[in-house]
């Protein structure tokens, strides 16, 4: 019986940088860790195609799940299509150590079912406004790691990173958060360390 792969759920609103994070993690870790990806889109496999086109991993290691309807249902109430995709990847690649599960774009209330992910990373972006951490919601308060992406846009949207950091601390208590600019790779190393340490990879 092969060892269960570590499953890391990556959630967050549309356009926050989930696919950018998935791609960056694949590029940084694929030489060291045997990995695969499941993406969720409502009606297309757009994110999966993007990852394949950018050579994130070999195409057969990326499965695009079309959720239809509400994307949060596929990661929460009825995770069966995602669990099936994970099962397919584990059968095809018995040595796989890490499977990233990227949710469809969602609201702040979406969370991953515990049976679907061992660790959850929630991505929000500065461009959505500095009040986002304050608004809370399970993604912000309960995820294992909160990623506040696109910090380069803070001056353009008049967002204060200090205010965001303060609000994230208030909402999350001891749970960690990290500021990132995934275009430049700023903060990526912290996310990788977190996955390695918490996931014992």
From Swiss-Prot:
SUPFAM superfamilies with a match to the protein in the record: P-loop containing nucleoside triphosphate hydrolases
Assembly and binders: Homodimer. UreD, UreF and UreG form a complex that acts as a GTP-hydrolysis-dependent molecular chaperone, activating the urease apoprotein by helping to assemble the nickel containing metallocenter of UreC. The UreE protein probably delivers the nickel.
Family affiliation: Belongs to the SIMIBI class G3E GTPase family. UreG subfamily.
PANTHER family referenced in this protein's UniProt entry, alphabetically: UREASE ACCESSORY PROTEIN G
Main location: cytoplasm
Keyword terms: Chaperone, Cytoplasm, GTP-binding, Nickel insertion, Nucleotide-binding
One GO MF term attached to the UniProt entry: GTP binding
Residues given in the record as GTP binding sites: 12-19
Protein's recorded name: Urease accessory protein UreG
InterPro entries assigned to the protein according to its UniProt record, in alphabetical order: CobW/HypB/UreG_nucleotide-bd, P-loop_NTPase, UreG
ATP-binding found in the keyword field: no
Record GO biological process: urea catabolic process
Pfam families recorded: cobW
GO cellular component terms attached to this protein's record: cytoplasm
Described function: Facilitates the functional incorporation of the urease nickel metallocenter. This process requires GTP hydrolysis, probably effectuated by UreG.
Location(s) in or outside the cell: Cytoplasm
Species whose genome carries this gene: Dechloromonas aromatica (strain RCB)
Keyword Cytoplasm found: yes
